[in-house]
Amino acid sequence: MDVGMMMIFASYGWDDCPDGQVWEEEIKLARIAADSGFNCLWSAEHHFNDYSFVPDNINLMTYLSAICPDIDVGTAAVILPWHDPLRVAENAAVLDLLSKGRLRFGMGRGLARREFDAFRISMDETRGRFDEAAPMIIEALKTGFMEGDGPFYKQPRIEIRPRPQHSFEGRIYAVASSEDSVDSAAKLGAHHVMFADRPWEMRAPVIEHGRELHRKYH
């Protein structure tokens, strides 16, 4: 069994709790999880809200990989529509280099309108941006090169430096709850990430459908 800890960085319901204290407490929990033999530390990406405020989970995991050297670190997830795919690939490559191959790279497309509005990105573009950026990033992490010629990202072929040092086989994840996202994750060959926000009796058929699609595509 693989056991991880999801880091949210939330202060919702904590009256007058400083943001710095929230972060200090989460880092303490991360250390406890690492020392207790957990397999992976995971972090969401959210912005501007008490519900969760960790705007750069790759940056966070680079720090945690240094202070917790015996546990994997994962992103659940980097919200691709909010980022340039080239920068995501570069930053992930740096984290994986410094952590000696301990990154589990997870991607998502986001869902909070408040966040999309702040980044001046239409929610109508989330599926297109994700489906375009995700394979570009995966290809860059696997081969060291990125290029793209889609409607959102015109990227001339360029080499990623530092070059990826470790195989990302089996270390790519995608958050998927909707039917479209489950299909997208399967096409990418990514591990399927699903949050426990409803009874597992409702989730189990979706998970099994994702497995069937993965077998179909691969």
Spans of model-derived segments:
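Internal, glycine-rich beta/alpha segment that forms the wall or movable "lid"
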Residues: 84-190, 204-208, 217
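Aromatic/hydrophobic pocket-lining residues that form π-stacking "cages" and hydrophobic walls in ligand
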Residues: 26-29, 61-64, 88, 92, ...
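Alpha-helix N-cap and loop-to-helix initiation/capping positions
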Residues: 17-25, 52-56, 83, 87, ...
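Active-site beta-loop-alpha junctions enriched in small/polar residues
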Residues: 8-10, 46, 78-80, 108-110, ...
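Active-site-adjacent beta->alpha loops and helix N-cap segments on the catalytic face
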Residues: 53-59, 199-212
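N-terminal beta1-alpha1-beta2 module of alpha/beta enzyme domains
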Residues: 1-73, 170
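Flexible loop/turn segments at secondary-structure boundaries
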Residues: 12-13, 50, 82-83, 181-182, ...
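Hydrophobic faces of well-ordered beta-strands that scaffold small-molecule active sites
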Residues: 3-7, 41-43, 73-76, 103-107, ...
